Regions:
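N-terminal Rossmann-like dinucleotide/flavin-binding domain of flavoprotein oxidoreductases
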Residues: 2-28, 67-70, 74-139, 218-244, ...
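Core beta-strand elements of the Rossmann-like FAD/NAD(P) dinucleotide-binding domain
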Residues: 28-30, 136-144, 261-269, 307
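FAD-site-proximal beta/loop scaffold in flavoenzymes
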Residues: 162-178, 264-340, 428
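A Rossmann-like FAD-binding core segment of flavoenzymes
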Residues: 107, 119-122, 126-134, 201-302, ...
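Glycine-rich dinucleotide-binding loop and its adjacent helix/turn
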Residues: 12-20, 72, 149-204, 208, ...
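Flexible, glycine-rich terminal cap/loop adjacent to redox cofactors
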Residues: 4, 35-40, 49-61, 73, ...
Length: 484
């Protein structure tokens, strides 16, 4: 089938899952067998191989996992394309995402990992005992095993939803024709980002969310900023709206009827963005004595060991913090703990997250909702980017930053940033938190002028001013009077 960008798809497939590939024959015991070639698995495998160990990597679909194939890369390519072009064309936008994906594919390819010393096996993995895993019928002897199988979109038990064959992140980027209209179930990060993309492509978009606001896990001000932006882009928001059923249209026309709060919304396509479930059900974990939660997440300790101490796990199959950068950090711990003494812990990682709408929303640590629910006293320091000289000079110079500190202290508990570069601006706060540096430490740094990064120095100044109590002021006054 020919469509714009189809040659890029062929290139990507040939690199990530070559059809004529023949699995190697195991030669002795592996130091590490990694199951799953997404971010956690790729980094674990190439990191271990780079240290000289003997490594096998098993992948049942395509190298690169969700991030490259059906997640971060294609979604950000579409967001960038539709933001840059005033009247973006659907075919050209999707051809661009395919070109971007094909350009990154060599980095995650079977060939690259083979050249790095990793034995790549394409096929289904499963345990046949507590100490042995197979790819197909082939056992792979291993000293240690790392499960990095990721997660996939959940299809909740809404009547008629599964039968409607809805789009998910695994299929939406394969579209070759523009939908006439789109109902998106779930206004988390994925739902909001894709709503913005398709609205920019002149698709009629309906976004449904059970909570009273989009991005319900963010602070209210951030949610409201994104909600307003989505409305301005043409998205129809259905908030506090529990979808009751999805059915074929009554009038016989192609498409779907989404029932919500007693009303019917007609759309040509439905997309589900209502959470994710781990890819663990085919691994035969019980035979290996590996415990899971009710949701199927693999239970690990702070060193990523499972209940089978020979087996470790990392990435989306273990955690509700399902971000590529989190998987990256866990994978680095996997390399240390499986090859050497298990000294690397992941229980105190500082994990930011970002929604790449316009404006972007980035957060790290705890926010006021978490702190108040836990009964923690805190101070909030806030600064609006429009008050910066750079912000005044920019057309999109609005947005704000909030930093939450321990009451009466500069210890940072969390932060929220809203603005067109929030994902970049959250980084120095993560650096401070990771190194246990307080907000006042930012006041000692020099920031280029005029930049939006100056917000952090302004927040540090605000904290330092808070220490100028009446008692301190009286001492200063006395000293200045004495030295006059």
């Amino acid at each position: 089938m020919s469509y714009p960008g189809h040659l890029f798809d062929a290139t990507t497939a040939a690199l990530l899952s070559p059809p004529d590939y023949i699995n190697p024959t195991p030669q002795g015991r592996y130091h590490l067998v990694v199951v799953g070639a997404g971010p956690a698995g790729l980094i674990s495998a190439i990191g271990a191989a780079g240290l000289g160990s003997k490594v096998a990597l098993i992948e049942r679909h395509r190298m690169g996992g969700d991030c490259l194939n059906v997640g971060c890369v294609p979604s950000k390519a579409l967001l960038e394309y539709t933001s840059y072009h005033k009247n973006p064309d659907f075919d050209e936008a999707f051809a661009w995402l395919r070109e971007v994906r094909a350009g990154i594919a060599p980095h995650d390819s079977v060939a690259r990992y083979g050249e790095a010393g990793v034995d790549v096996y394409l096929g289904d993995a499963s345990f046949n005992s507590a100490g042995e895993i197979c790819v197909g019928d082939q056992p792979l002897p291993a000293r240690r095993i790392a499960i990095c199988t990721g997660a996939r979109a959940a299809i909740p038990p809404i009547p008629g939803l599964r039968e409607s064959n809805p789009l998910t992140n695994e299929s939406v980027f394969d579209l070759t024709e523009k939908p006439a209209s789109l109902a998106i179930l779930g206004a988390g990060a994925i739902g909001c980002e894709l709503a913005l993309v398709f609205a920019r492509l002149n698709v009629e978009v309906h976004l449904f969310e059970l909570a009273p606001r989009v991005l319900p896990l963010e602070v209210t001000a951030a949610s409201e900023a994104v909600g307003e932006a989505l409305r301005s882009a043409g998205v129809t928001l259905h908030l506090g709206a529990g979808v009751e059923s999805v059915a074929a249209r009554d009038d016989g026309a192609p498409g779907h009827s989404v029932s919500v709060n007693g009303k019917q919304v007609l759309t040509s396509h439905v997309l589900v963005a209502l959470g994710r479930i781990p890819n663990t059900e085919t691994l035969n974990l019980q035979s290996a004595g590996i415990d899971t939660t009710e949701r199927g997440l693999i239970v690990t300790d702070k060193k990523l060991r499972t209940s089978n101490k020979k087996v470790y796990a990392a990435g989306d199959c273990t955690s509700t913090l399902q971000f590529t950068h989190h998987a990256d950090a866990q994978a680095r711990a996997i390399v240390q703990n499986t090859l050497f003494a298990p000294t690397a812990s992941v229980d105190k990682l500082v994990v930011p997250h970002c929604t790449y709408t316009k404006p972007e929303v980035a957060s790290v640590g705890q926010n006021p909702d978490h702190l108040e629910a836990a009964g923690v006293d805190y101070d909030c320091y806030e600064f609006n980017f429009a008050e910066l000289d750079r912000g005044r000079a920019e057309i999109n110079g609005d947005g704000f930053a909030q930093v939450y500190t321990e009451k009466g202290s500069d210890k940072i508990l969390g932060a929220t940033i809203v603005g067109h570069d929030a994902g970049e601006q959250i980084a120095p706060i993560c650096l401070l938190m990771s190194n246990r540096l307080g907000l006042s430490a930012a006041g000692k740094a020099l920031f280029s002028y005029p930049t939006r990064s100056e917000y952090l120095k302004r927040l540090a100044d605000a904290y330092n001013r808070s220490r100028f109590t009446p008692r301190v002021a009286a001492i200063f006054k006395a000293w200045l009077g004495f030295t006059a």
